[in-house]
Every structure is written in C-alpha cells, then in structure tokens.
C-alpha cells in the first residue's frame, strides 16, 4: 500500500499498473491533504487505471468518488486485495464497468455491462470455472410456463413459476419475463405491477447448467440486447413492486433493484456470485445496484461474494 504523498509522484506515470504488474492499487488516504487542483488531477488518474483502486480512508472524503473500494482498516485492504487477486480479470472489468455506467443513461449503461460480460465470457477465468462444473443436468425446468401473469383492473401480477429450478433465470424464464415487462412498457393502462415468485426462494440467479452453451460471445451479446428483461423493466421503475423471499442471488436481486419498490421477508438474503465465476453481474446488476446502494458497496458485494441478509 502506498501513501497519499507518494501518489502525487506516481501520477506522472499514465498507466501505473502497466509498469509494475500489480492486480490492484491500494492507497492510504487517511492523512491526505490535497489542494483542489491535486484532487482533480489525482481523481482523473485513478479512474484511468485498468485495475481496481482501494482507498484506506478515515474521515477524509477528498478522493472518495474516484475509488472503487473504500476500506476502514489495513486488514480490510488486504482482504480485498486477496479476493481481487483470485479473479483479477473479472474484478478489473467489474470496476471499469461500474465507473463508466454511473454516468450513463440506463439503457446505454446496460449495453456497456453486456459488452463487459461478453469480454469475460471469452476469458480464462470463466473457462476455468466452467471446467469445474459437473454436467449432471440438461438445465432448465420442465414447467411449460415459467412466468405467469394475471391482470386485475389496472394491476398486473407476474409470478416466477419455476420452483423446482429455484426460479433460475433460464432462457425460458428470461424470455417470459421479457415478454411480461415488454407488455407493461406498451400498455399505459397497467398502472401497478407486482412481481413475486413461487417456491422456497425468489430466484437463485442464472441457470448454471446453461452457462457456457453459447461459444460465440458476440452473438451472446446480441441476444442479451434483444432479450434481457432489464431493458424493459428499467424504463418504468415506478410502476413495479417486487416481493422477495429466500435466496435472491445474481439476477434474483439485479432485476428487482431496478424497481421503484421492494419488500422482503425476513428469510431473504442476497449474493452476487458472478466474479468468482470469472464474470460480472450480467442481468443488469452493474447498473441497477450501484444506483441503489452506491458503486463502492456494489463492487464490494461482487468481489467478495458475501451473503447479505435482509437485516443488513
């Protein structure tokens, strides 16, 4: 970890990571005292770095917005650096995407997320994760209608109806949700949309048995642009209420985070496991979650993969 004074000299090197080969940059800002011009220059330099930037902070908020992670102790810095080192490709793409998307319109931000996801689909970390998966299932669910809709007056109820598959975002579930959310976008007479799920949990995220099926990452990006539910949901957040329970993993929280209102039962918990798979949140989470809880917390949840209970 370098100190705040040394950083003023480091910024003479445009891309610091290229010269030292480090997987992340950790800086102790606890005693930083920069002029306004120095804050601007250092912030711009930090955001240009292709590796995650961790800041050890006390009450000093001068450089806060330029950081990818904020730590309170040196031990926390070491922990974050360890997680990043285990998945350096995915961690780097994650922070690059969340840096950019915060300043973009939602639909443009979703495109950036999909491009980052596609990049990692062709990467060594994801390939390594795939090689460790047991191919014991053909995936999906045998339920013919994984998404059910019922309208009462101006309210539309949408039910994730694949409990045997823990309501995983399979291709059929994805397409069903896109159809439902698209209907809402086209029908102004639908004033309220309530989304809930059958079974023991809201959604366990992507259907792992379908991961790696598409070998053409450019085509996979094209399909996401056409089919991902987030693009329809994100345009009308105020009309949506999500009722969550049990596991909300990956897409199981990435999509609800777009909604204007979320309620959760006491057994609800959240996780973003994608970085450990060599990927980034790809169902809209790099866009929806930072807008809800901030970029630092989103990056932390994604890189550590920690389980967050509803009490937290």
Label each PLM-derived region with a short phrase:
Residues 1-45, 129-196:
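Conserved CoA-thioester-binding segment of acyl-CoA-metabolizing enzymes
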Residues 96, 200-203, 249:
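Short, active-site-adjacent cap segments at secondary-structure transitions
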Residues 43-44, 76-137, 285-312:
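Crotonase-superfamily enoyl-CoA hydratase/isomerase domain that binds
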Residues 55-84, 234-312:
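Crotonase-fold acyl-CoA enzyme core
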Residues 1-103:
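Ordered, small/hydrophobic-rich secondary-structure cores
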Residues 94, 195, 255-256:
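Hydrophobic/aromatic residues within transmembrane alpha-helices
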Residues 41-46, 180, 225-236:
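Catalytic-core regions built around general acid/base machinery
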Residues 61, 197-231:
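Glycine- (often His-adjacent) and acidic-residue-rich active-site loop
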